[in-house]
A protein has these predicted regions:
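Iron-sulfur cluster-binding cysteine motifs and their immediate structural context
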Residues: 109, 115, 119-136, 140-142, ...
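FMN-binding flavodoxin-like domain, especially the glycine-rich phosphate-binding loop
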Residues: 1-100, 159-178
């Protein structure tokens, strides 16, 4: 699992269960820090060289265990997290610790910067940005930030006050590097 320097919550246990439902068996699990989708500050510059060494060592250990004991010998991998029903979704709060609802927040477009290249629509994992008019969000936005981070002209941004307050809280609390 990769997470943005806050927490991976039940991500690994959920992934293990999804794999099992599809007939796959987990042979190892780890969580690594990567740049958070909301911010270039949270987990910025990660994974770094040290992270990559740790990941490579982890992968080598898994391969060695499989080569020595065979895939059939692998037992159930115990992972952190709350078994189904999982612990629920992360509850966003603002800087005053009040609960905020950012589900309907969508990216805005600075028309003075946008040249209509459509890269934001191509990068949108949900297909939420209209390909013919990339200023329009016509589907469900999951706030992954791909449109913002990949826009070559810096035209995409979030301006919702609750979202920005939540982002400020995350950057205040979770900027220190985690290993």
């Amino acid at each position: 699992a990769v997470y943005g320097n806050r927490a991976y919550d039940d991500g690994i246990i959920e992934l293990r269960e999804i794999m099992a439902e599809d007939g796959l068996r987990l042979v190892g699990a780890a969580a690594f820090v990567g740049e958070h989708t909301f911010s270039r500050i949270l987990g910025g510059g990660r994974p770094d060289g040290e992270d990559l060494v740790i990941a490579e060592e982890f992968a080598s250990e898994i391969v060695q265990n499989l080569l020595l004991s065979g895939a059939g010998a692998a037992g159930r991998v115990e992972v952190p997290g709350t078994p189904y029903p999982y612990s629920g979704f992360y509850k966003a709060t603002d800087t005053s610790k009040k609960s905020v609802d950012i589900r309907k927040v969508v990216p805005q477009t600075d028309l003075t910067k946008c040249d209509g290249c459509g890269l934001c629509a191509k990068m949108c994992a949900m297909g939420a940005i209209d390909f013919t008019d990339c200023t329009q969000v016509v589907g469900k936005c999951i706030k992954c930030g791909a449109c913002i981070k990949r826009c070559p002209r810096g035209a995409k941004y979030f301006d919702d006050p609750q979202y920005l307050s939540h982002l400020a809280l995350l950057e205040e609390k979770f900027t220190s590097p985690r290993r």
